[in-house]
């Protein structure tokens, strides 16, 4: 290179830059069988538009295993999704609120259940209110109740408690039940009913939604992955879909806290009978 630069009376750095520009740039890496994965990934992304590449990886691998094909790692799925413009926008929100360093998650199923309520707004102004009970280990929705244009009553919560106990236990013996301080949970009748079922009622501190973080996280997931991507013209339409949403969450939703397994898969792995659909 020095001899050429001296003969042409130019700087070596200039020649290096010329050579670098003439060199063919390396294209994006592709494996020969990426084309076999692309239709599967595209279908899953179309079906689950709110899922990122890790959850898409979990769903894709379930289907690959069923058909006897080797699984794909998340880096490969990420690369294929990036090359085809299927990645979600990066989350830029900042978490606000006080630090919560308590521990809500437990080491096995049926040690603690969490419960909360939320509402869904329909396009015509109807409101659908829901309450649910979720296991703090396997994240399965054990019982739920929904009502249109009315509030969740104490009797509905008590029915939900009984359904949860009957679903998980042959005998009446149940775990801690962690809720917020809503009146339907703190009512004397509800607390007495919980005690009769051998539930141990626990309530979060005032102004500390993080203490019921499993329930809060589920509400966020449910609204993002189901409510906001489906048509909700009125309460009747919403009520018709809710049962299917809960069933799909229990059977299919990959959860990062369960090593990307669904709640149903986690129950089966732990030799625990899941709630029937």
Question: For the regions a protein language model found, what residue spans apply to each?
Answer:
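Basic, flexible linker segments flanking DNA-binding modules
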Residues: 13-112, 262-273
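Short alpha-helical "recognition helix" segments of helix-turn-helix
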Residues: 2-7, 56
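Mobile-element integrase/transposase regions
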Residues: 75-134, 140, 156-174, 277
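RNase H-like polynucleotidyl transferase catalytic core
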Residues: 4, 93-95, 146, 174-181, ...
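A short acidic/small-residue loop/turn micro-motif
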Residues: 135-136, 146-153
């Amino acid at each position: 290179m020095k001899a050429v630069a001296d003969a042409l009376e130019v700087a070596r750095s200039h020649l290096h830059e010329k050579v670098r520009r003439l060199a063919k740039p390396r294209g994006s890496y592709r494996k020969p069988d990426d084309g076999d994965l692309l239709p599967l990934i595209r279908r899953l992304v179309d079906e689950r538009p709110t899922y990122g590449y890790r959850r898409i990886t979990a769903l894709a691998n379930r289907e690959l295993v069923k058909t006897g094909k080797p699984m794909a790692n998340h880096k490969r799925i990420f690369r294929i999704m990036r090359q085809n413009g299927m990645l979600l926008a990066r989350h830029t929100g900042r978490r606000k609120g006080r630090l919560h360093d308590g521990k809500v998650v437990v080491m096995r199923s049926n040690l603690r259940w969490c419960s909360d309520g939320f509402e869904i707004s329909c396009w015509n102004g109807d409101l659908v209110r829901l309450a649910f009970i979720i296991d703090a280990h396997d994240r399965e929705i054990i019982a739920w109740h929904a009502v249109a244009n009315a509030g969740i009553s104490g009797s509905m919560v008590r029915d939900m408690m009984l359904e949860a106990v009957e679903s998980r236990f042959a005998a009446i013996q149940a775990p801690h039940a962690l809720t917020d301080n809503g009146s339907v949970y703190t009512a004397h009748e509800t607390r007495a009913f919980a005690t009769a079922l051998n539930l141990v009622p626990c309530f979060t501190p005032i102004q500390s939604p993080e203490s019921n973080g499993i329930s809060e996280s589920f509400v966020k997931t449910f609204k993002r992955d189901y409510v906001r991507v489906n048509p909700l013209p009125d309460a009747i339409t919403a009520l018709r879909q809710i049962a299917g949403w809960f069933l799909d969450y229990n059977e299919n939703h990959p959860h990062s806290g369960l090593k990307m397994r669904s709640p149903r898969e986690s129950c089966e792995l732990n030799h625990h009978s899941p709630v029937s659909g």
